[in-house]
From Swiss-Prot:
Record's subcellular location: Membrane
Glycosylation sites recorded in the entry for this protein: N162, N286, N371, N421, N422, N499
Primary localisation category: membrane
Role this protein plays: Involved in parasite invasion of erythrocytes.
Pfam families: AMA-1
Protein name: Apical membrane antigen 1
Organism, as annotated: Plasmodium falciparum (isolate FC27 / Papua New Guinea)
Extracellular topological intervals: 25-546
Disulfide bond positions: C149-C302, C217-C247, C263-C275, C320-C418, C337-C409, C443-C502, C490-C507, C492-C509
InterPro entries: Apmem_Ag1 (IPR003298), Apmem_Ag1_dom_sf (IPR024056)
Family the entry assigns: Belongs to the apicomplexan parasites AMA1 family.
GO cellular-component term (any): membrane
Membrane-spanning ranges: 547-567
Topology with respect to the bilayer: Single-pass type I membrane protein
C-alpha cells in the first residue's frame, strides 16, 4: 500500500512538472516562443513587411535619447532579439536603460468598482414597477416583486386621496378608498413592527437575528403565508421607514393602476377602485421598497448613495469617455433628476388587464368578508391573472448624470462602465436614494491599477525572459489617465484634465484602438479588428499562467485526497466486522442531520419535495 502511495504522489508531481515546464524542452533557448502578445504604443502596421510580426509574438523597443519630434515617434520599428538595428525612441520620459512597451490588452480598471451599477445584473427586475416573478397561491399563478436590491425613496401615490399607502387595507364596513396597501392588523401584531420588535421576535433565529434592518424587514414580510396556503412561494413585499425604524408589510403588491376602465379618481365614490402609481415623492424619501429577494449583502453589491463629482461614462481603450447619446431634461436639483430617472426606469407593469376587474362589488365584498379569493386577482397584483406578464429583467433607463451648473438631467439606458471625475456632475441611478450623496471619488484607482499591472507583467517577464544586458523592460497597461503623470509611461507630456477634483493627467499622444458608436456601443476600430479577432474576450495571456498554477494545485490536491481515501478505506475494512448491530446503521449523529434544509423553505427558494414546510419556526399567518 505504501508503494502505491509513493507511485501516486510521484505521478502527480511528474504531471505537474509537465504542465508547467514540458518534458525535455529547453525554454531558455526559445524565451519568446509562447510569450504574451504585446504591440508597441504607436505601431499601426505601417512598417515594411519584414517588420510585420504576427500577433502572437512579443516585440522589444529600445529606448534611447532622440531629438526627433512626436510625428517621428508615430513610426517606431521593432528590433529582433539578435541585435538588429534598434527602433527609434518610443517615449522620452525614462532613462536609456528602460525599455517600455505598451500592452495590447484593453482592460477596464473600473470593472470591480462598477459592478454594483450593472442594474440588470444586480437587481434583475423592474424598478418603477417590480413584478419580476410568478408564484402560485391556492392553485392560481400570480406575479410578485422580486428585485434583489432595495429601491430607496420609492412609495405609492393614491390619486385624489389623503390616505397614504402605508395605511392598512380596508376591511369590514370600511369603504374601499378608506384603506391603503399595508397589512391589516393581526394578533400578534406583525405589521407595522419596529426594528427593536423584529430583533426581539427573531432573537433565537440565527439565520435572521443579525441581518441589517432592510434585509430583516424583507425576510419578516416573506414569513407571512398568503391565503393560508402553506405550500405557496408567494412572499409579500415591504416598506422600511428609516425615520421611524418601522417595517410595513404590504398586503397589496400592485404598484400601478390607472385608466377609467380599472379605477375611479372620483373621491366621492368611496367604494370604487382607487387609482395609484409608484413615485419618488418628497414624503417618501425615508422609505425603502423591498421585495422578498433583497440580498443580505446589498450594501456591497447595490447602489445607494449618489456620486458627487462624478459622471457615468464608457471605458474606451484607456480612458473614460462621455456617453454620446442621452436624453436630456431640466431638473432644478438632484432630487428632481433622480425622480425623472425613476419614472423612466425598468418597469414590469402589465399592458393589458381583465374585464372582470371592473367588478367593484366583488372586490368590495372581498374586503368586507376578508375573502382573499375575491380580491387576489386585483391585488396580487392588478392585471396579473390571465393578463400579459411582461418582465423587464431590469432593462431600462436606469442611470442619469445631473449637471449642477446647467441644471440638466442626462438619462440613458446603456450600462456605464466607468466614472468621469467632473466637479459639475452627480451620478445617480433609479435605485439610489433621492438626496443622499457620497464624495469619495476613487482618485488613486488608475495609479494603483497601473502599478499592479506593471508589477504583474514584470514577474511574468522574469519567468520567460533571459535578458543578460541588464535593461529593465516595462509592459505598460493601456490606461492613459492617472493622478500621477509619471505612472502613465506617456511618450509625450500628459495634459491636465479640466474640472477634475483629482488633478488627473491624460496621455493623448497614444492612438486609441477602440471608439464609441452613435448608439453608445464601444467597438474596436476597423484597422485593429483583425488583431483582436484571435483573442477571445480580449483577456490578457497572463491568465493562462493562473490556469496552469491552478491545474497543478488541483492535481496535487486530488493525489492527496486519493491517498487519504485509500488509507481510510483500509481502516474501515478492518472495522467492518465490528459494525454488526442494526441500530448503528442509518442513524443520524445529531438533530441537525434530521432537519430539512431551512434556507430552501424559509427563504422562498424553488419548491422541492422536502422543502414545502418550514422547519425553523412557525410562520404566522393571517
Amino acid at each position: 500500500m505504501r508503494k502505491l502511495y509513493c507511485v501516486l504522489l510521484l505521478s502527480a508531481f511528474e504531471f505537474t512538472y509537465m504542465i508547467n515546464f514540458g518534458r525535455g524542452q529547453n525554454y531558455w533557448e526559445h524565451p519568446y516562443q509562447k510569450s504574451d502578445v504585446y504591440h508597441p504604443i504607436n505601431e499601426h502596421r505601417e512598417h515594411p513587411k519584414e517588420y510585420q510580426y504576427p500577433l502572437h509574438q512579443e516585440h522589444t523597443y529600445q529606448q534611447e535619447d532622440s531629438g526627433e519630434d512626436e510625428n517621428t515617434l508615430q513610426h517606431a520599428y521593432p528590433i529582433d532579439h539578435e541585435g538588429a538595428e534598434p527602433a527609434p525612441q518610443e517615449q522620452n520620459l525614462f532613462s536609456s536603460i528602460e525599455i517600455v512597451e505598451r500592452s495590447n490588452y484593453m482592460g477596464n480598471p473600473w470593472t470591480e468598482y462598477m459592478a454594483k451599477y450593472d442594474i440588470e445584473e444586480v437587481h434583475g427586475s423592474g424598478i418603477r414597477v417590480d413584478l419580476g416573478e410568478d408564484a402560485e397561491v391556492a392553485g392560481t399563478q400570480y406575479r410578485l416583486p422580486s428585485g434583489k436590491c432595495p429601491v430607496f425613496g420609492k412609495g405609492i401615490i393614491i390619486e385624489n386621496s389623503n390616505t397614504t399607502f402605508l395605511t392598512p387595507v380596508a376591511t369590514g364596513n370600511q369603504y374601499l378608498k378608506d384603506g391603503g396597501f399595508a397589512f391589516p392588523p393581526t394578533e400578534p401584531l406583525m405589521s407595522p413592527m419596529t426594528l427593536d420588535e423584529m430583533r426581539h421576535f427573531y432573537k433565537d433565529n440565527k439565520y435572521v437575528k443579525n441581518l441589517d434592518e432592510l434585509t430583516l424587514c424583507s425576510r419578516h414580510a416573506g414569513n407571512m403565508i398568503p391565503d393560508n396556503d402553506k405550500n405557496s412561494n408567494y412572499k409579500y413585499p415591504a416598506v422600511y421607514d428609516d425615520k421611524d425604524k418601522k417595517c410595513h408589510i404590504l398586503y397589496i403588491a400592485a404598484q400601478e393602476n390607472n385608466g377609467p376602465r380599472y379605477c375611479n379618481k372620483d373621491e366621492s365614490k368611496r367604494n370604487s377602485m382607487f387609482c395609484f402609481r409608484p413615485a419618488k415623492d418628497i414624503s417618501f424619501q425615508n422609505y425603502t421598497y423591498l421585495s422578498k429577494n433583497v440580498v443580505d449583502n446589498w450594501e456591497k453589491v447595490c447602489p445607494r448613495k449618489n456620486l458627487q463629482n462624478a459622471k457615468f461614462g464608457l471605458w474606451v481603450d484607456g480612458n473614460c469617455e462621455d456617453i454620446p447619446h442621452v436624453n436630456e431634461f431640466s431638473a432644478i436639483d438632484l432630487f428632481e433628476c433622480n425622480k425623472l430617472v425613476f419614472e423612466l426606469s425598468a418597469s414590469d407593469q402589465p399592458k393589458q388587464y381583465e374585464q372582470h376587474l371592473t367588478d367593484y362589488e366583488k372586490i368590495k365584498e372581498g374586503f368586507k368578508n376578508k375573502n382573499a379569493s375575491m380580491i387576489k386577482s386585483a391585488f396580487l397584483p392588478t392585471g396579473a391573472f390571465k393578463a400579459d406578464r411582461y418582465k423587464s429583467h431590469g432593462k431600462g433607463y436606469n442611470w442619469g448624470n445631473y449637471n449642477t451648473e446647467t441644471q440638466k438631467c442626462e438619462i440613458f439606458n446603456v450600462k456605464p462602465t466607468c466614472l468621469i471625475n467632473n466637479s459639475s456632475y452627480i451620478a445617480t441611478t433609479a435605485l439610489s436614494h433621492p438626496i443622499e450623496v457620497e464624495h469619495n471619488f476613487p482618485c488613486s484607482l488608475y495609479k494603483n491599477e497601473i502599478m499592479k499591472e506593471i508589477e504583474r507583467e514584470s514577474k511574468r517577464i522574469k519567468l520567460n525572459d533571459n535578458d543578460d544586458e541588464g535593461n529593465k523592460k516595462i509592459i505598460a497597461p493601456r490606461i492613459f489617465i492617472s493622478d500621477d503623470k509619471d505612472s502613465l509611461k506617456c511618450p509625450c507630456d500628459p495634459e491636465i484634465v479640466s474640472n477634475s477634483t483629482c488633478n488627473f493627467f491624460v496621455c493623448k499622444c497614444v492612438e486609441r484602438r477602440a471608439e464609441v458608436t452613435s448608439n453608445n456601443e464601444v467597438v474596436v476600430k476597423e484597422e485593429y479588428k483583425d488583431e483582436y479577432a484571435d483573442i477571445p474576450e480580449h483577456k490578457p495571456t497572463y491568465d493562462k499562467m493562473k490556469i496552469i498554477i491552478a491545474s497543478s494545485a488541483a492535481v496535487a490536491v486530488l493525489a492527496t485526497i486519493l491517498m487519504v481515501y485509500l488509507y481510510k478505506r483500509k481502516g474501515n475494512a478492518e472495522k467492518y466486522d465490528k459494525m454488526d448491530e442494526p441500530q448503528h446503521y442509518g442513524k443520524s449523529n445529531s438533530r441537525n442531520d434530521e432537519m430539512l434544509d431551512p434556507e430552501a423553505s424559509f427563504w422562498g427558494e424553488e419548491k422541492r419535495a422536502s422543502h414545502t414546510t418550514p422547519v425553523l419556526m412557525e410562520k404566522p399567518y393571517y
